[in-house]
UniProtKB/Swiss-Prot annotation:
GO terms for molecular function: DNA binding. The lineage of its organism: Bacteria, Pseudomonadati, Pseudomonadota, Alphaproteobacteria, Hyphomicrobiales. Belongs to the SfsA family. Pfam families: SfsA, SfsA_N. This is Sugar fermentation stimulation protein homolog. It comes from the Bacteria. Signal peptide: none annotated. PANTHER family: SUGAR FERMENTATION STIMULATION PROTEIN A. The gene is sfsA.
Amino acid sequence: MLFTPPLIPATLISRYKRFLFDAVLEDGTAITGSCPNTGSMRGLTTPGSRIWLSEHDSPTRKYRHMFEMVEADGTVVGINTGMPNRLAEEAILNGRIPELAGYSTIRREQKYGRNSRIDFLLSEPGRPDAYVEVKNVHFMREKGLAEFPDTATKRGAKHLEELGDAAEAGYRSVMLYLIQRDDCERMRICADLDPIYALAFQRAMARGVEAYAVKCAVSPTQISVSGTVKMDEWRPAVL
């Protein structure tokens, strides 16, 4: 996925109220913009960090600039939580995720479960439908190891339970973790920050849910899925 025009570099001053950030552009202009990530963004909001912004001229927007990427640990990291579904769809259609290849139809936001919508429903004659839920990942504490979640997520645990229900009903159920950085070779479930999600993940795997992780090549000019990442196993004492 290309950014046209390319993103604008800036220096982060602060990110606050979850939705807002202050920054200074390269010409010295101080700006306030919108942050398309309501999560903790743990480790990605250090004042003075180099960041990249998209620019929008729509008169209906309150803020002209949107926070898109940040340099952290020597690599560029995507922070826009609206991006993973777009990247996943592009990668699935282009066959870049082998585990999800071979489906001729892809539908977005289909109703399923208990008043929920699945990110993607993949269909192919002669094969069970595949329900695919996508999660955004950018948290890293140990070099080369991405982790999810970076804070407690009841909604995430609910998604795992509903995927398990679909798997037991005979459908293919897939949790796809999309990592918006390229400096990782492994991914694991972050049990210390959200033990409830970790238990829900293990239960889902036992019910037949599949889990895959992919990383992205990220730059101010483009972002795309670049390869698969091994998922570390984590087993709780009690299911």
